[in-house]
Curated annotation (Swiss-Prot):
Belongs to the UPF0702 family. InterPro entries: DUF421 (IPR007353), UPF0702_alpha/beta_dom_sf (IPR023090), YetF_N (IPR048454). It comes from Bacillus subtilis (strain 168). It is a multi-pass membrane protein. This is UPF0702 transmembrane protein YdfS. Pfam families: DUF421 (PF04239), YetF_N (PF20730). The keyword Transmembrane helix applies. GO terms for cellular component: plasma membrane. The chain crosses the membrane at residues 32-52, 60-80. It is found in: Cell membrane. Keywords: Cell membrane, Membrane, Transmembrane, Transmembrane helix.
Amino acid sequence: MIELEVVIRTVASFGLLLIAERILGKQTISQMTIFDFIAAITLGAIAAGLAYNTSIKPHNMAISFSIFVLTIFLISFLSIKNRKLRKFFAGDPTVLIQNGKILESNMRKMRYTLDYLNQQLREKEIFNIEEVLFAILETNGQLTVLRKPQFRHVTKQDLMIAVNQEQRLPIELIMDGEIIENNLKQNRLTESWLLEELRKRDIKVKETVYAVLLGNGDIYVDQYKDHISVPMDKE
């Protein structure tokens, strides 16, 4: 009976989607890059075809679904290992506002309209562009905003120390055990300086997952071996 077959196929397709979710990992829609979004839509389309298209044999759809999941998994795995590949699929964040000035060339590249930019700022309770030090369009399409010091909410730290008026974006120095030489050159930093800073901390480049020069001049370093017990996400 065709109705019973559709029910079975629907349950099977839902089960395949759950398995795919377990393999590919947890991610919300708001965190998706363009690649993630395309992959999710394609998997959904294949699963939908398995559910209602009775003219196609179930095992053919299952094979197609499995191959696509495997392809996505391999690309994601390689992207974690290789920063250039990750940038190819996910892209780079784009600065849209710098020191209260809109960067029109970047807006055009991203096909980002002023109306949408103003909407995103209003959602963050910003009604004056001059309050913005940096506005960055992330790879997942979200807009992150850093206000100028005089327009930020007061914190306990602000009440204890004076605000440093000189502000800049953090500078990524090392990612996945590799020095980001382009960032060093653009910011007039040298590799010898970076290596010396790591030596002071008794850390090697290959041991470093992520190192960034913060806006206040401090260097944040995260190592592969943190020796931290994570209580969450254990099954």
